[in-house]
Amino acid sequence: MPNVRPLNKKKYGISKHAFGTAYSYCLQYPEWREELGSRTSTVKSPQITGMPGAHSGSDATANLAEHRVELREKMQKVEDTVREAVGDNKSLYEYLLEYVTTEGATFHWMKQKGIPCERTYFYETRRYFYYLMAKRI
């Protein structure tokens, strides 16, 4: 975790390891989105190894569908937690989602993108988000 300070354990009741887990979980969001967009086919070329092989009998389409559902649920968990953290301030949703899913994101970078709040409020919302996320995963 590059220069990311964990939450205050007294205030939020989660350890630095729980925070680290939530932080790392959210950073996987772009990977999930990319995989969800690219893995749509079960057709693969056979691998010729010269070794005899057995067919597993598994259903590749069902396996892919299950994996895609799992990825979508993980993404939905992050998105729902961001929605809950921002509350009535819906304009903050896209900025907080981008912030928590981008490694190395800073408030200064978000300010250049036009974030509609000030630093103190944003970091308070971010801390609340990580608190909620740590409780959900």
Question: What do the predicted segments below correspond to?
Answer:
Residues 2-3, 90, 134-137:
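Transcription-machinery-associated regions
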Residues 87-105:
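Short amphipathic alpha helix immediately N-terminal
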